[in-house]
């Protein structure tokens, strides 16, 4: 790593971002049933209602996360993923805290997200992170199925 990681806006088509999207898609394919994989690919993350942030140095994108504006004061957290070489350094928490700030600045009153349920151990760290940040369980989100492999969370923004 040549310099400290900085948070910046990113595009889904950037090579480093694309690499993390591919890694997240591979994780979803391995950790979740095919019928329960809601991971966004490059096209979905390029939609106008989606904003992506990256933690990166001049050479490497270490982590990504996105907000999808759902309207009515709500946004969905999407595609939070940390490259394997950077895990265990608190980058997901740092990125999530930035997403909270960005959502507040955009006028959102709440954030929602979907992740794998307790039935999918590959998502244990994600659930622990979200709970630790104050997210609580909520009902099924629009566009999702009621599925025992999904866990839905909501955070009211102050």
Where are these regions (language model features)?
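Short linear capping/connector segments at secondary-structure termini
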Residues: 37-40, 114-118, 147
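Acetyl-CoA-dependent GNAT
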Residues: 3-74, 78, 83, 96-97, ...
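A generic structural signal for beta-strand entry/edge sites
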Residues: 72-74, 110, 150
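Conserved active-site alpha-helix within GNAT-family acetyltransferase domains
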Residues: 93, 118-140, 146-148
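Conserved acetyl-CoA-binding loop-helix of GNAT-fold acetyltransferases
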Residues: 82, 88-105, 131-132
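Short strand-loop junctions, especially beta-strand C-caps/beta-turns
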Residues: 80, 85, 114-118
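Accessory recognition modules or surfaces
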Residues: 89, 104, 122-129, 149-158
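Conserved GNAT acetyl-CoA-binding A-motif
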Residues: 103-118
């Amino acid at each position: 790593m040549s310099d400290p990681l900085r948070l910046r806006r990113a595009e889904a088509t950037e090579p480093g971002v694309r690499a993390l999207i591919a890694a997240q898609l591979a994780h979803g394919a391995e950790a979740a049933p095919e019928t329960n994989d809601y991971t966004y690919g490059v096209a979905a993350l390029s939609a106008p209602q989606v904003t992506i942030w990256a933690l990166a140095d001049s050479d490497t994108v270490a982590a990504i996360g996105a907000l999808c504006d759902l309207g009515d004061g709500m946004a969905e957290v999407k595609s939070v993923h940390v490259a394997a070489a950077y895990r265990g350094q608190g980058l997901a928490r740092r990125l999530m805290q930035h997403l909270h700030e960005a959502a507040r600045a955009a006028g959102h009153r709440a954030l929602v997200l979907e992740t794998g349920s307790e039935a999918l151990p590959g998502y244990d760290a994600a659930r622990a992170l979200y709970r630790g940040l104050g997210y609580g369980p909520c009902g099924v989100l629009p566009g999702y199925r009621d599925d025992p492999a999904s866990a839905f969370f909501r955070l009211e923004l102050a």
